[in-house]
From Swiss-Prot:
Keywords: Ribonucleoprotein, Ribosomal protein. InterPro entries: Ribosomal_uS2 (IPR001865), Ribosomal_uS2_bac/mit/plastid (IPR005706), Ribosomal_uS2_CS (IPR018130), Ribosomal_uS2_flav_dom_sf (IPR023591). The keyword Ribosomal protein applies. Belongs to the universal ribosomal protein uS2 family. It holds the Pfam family Ribosomal_S2. GO terms for molecular function: structural constituent of ribosome. CDD domains: RPS2. This is Small ribosomal subunit protein uS2. GO terms for biological process: translation. Signal peptide: none annotated. NCBIfam families: rpsB_bact. SUPFAM superfamilies: Ribosomal protein S2. The keyword Ribonucleoprotein applies.
Amino acid sequence: MAVVTLSEMMEAGAHFGHQTRRWNPKMSRYIYCARNGVHIIDLVQTAICMNNAYKWTRSSARSGKRFLFVGTKKQASEVVALEATRCGASYVNQRWLGGMLTNWTTMKARIDRLKDLERMESSGAIAMRPKKEASVLRRELERLQKYLGGLKGMRRLPDVVVLVDQRRETNAVLEARKLDIPLVSMLDTNCDPDLCEVPIPCNDDAVRSVQLVLGRLADAINEGRHGTNEQRGADDNDD
């Protein structure tokens, strides 16, 4: 049975690429045609790639690999958080901070600081501080929650990065490749398929397209871990 059908992808607008002048020639094998100055993605190729990505992701999850979902653009932010949480993965959905992977020791210290501040807030320790100091601590807490909240359960580097919009997340791509962390990437017609291990050619701007792809990948992770794609948990948060 196909992981995703052609009609589902059509309804999600997964076939719409970018303007032809913005294309990356390396994506030519995934492009069906050009229409009104816009490239149309070959959804038969997308279906094949989705099947491969599902199997690869499921196998990785079954072997205990940990996942990081990355997508900071407005259209993807909410979906990234939702689907990562559903399959127990970590996520970055606001802004990629330099060194999130390559300077992990420093990043982990900031995550630990976030946890400390959350404990202080919940215990009332911040409220007991002088008003000015409490205000400073709460601003720090708010900022850390915004940018690092999706990483609180990530005790070590991820084994796999799932990416929305390769062009936007250039720093995440560079850091993952530097550390030999494989990438499962949604690739629009302006992307480079050579920069990922598991390509999924599709529209990475439409919310429904992002929902469709990330939803299936989250299903694959849950199936690999639990034998069902309905399981919800926080497996990446467990040692």
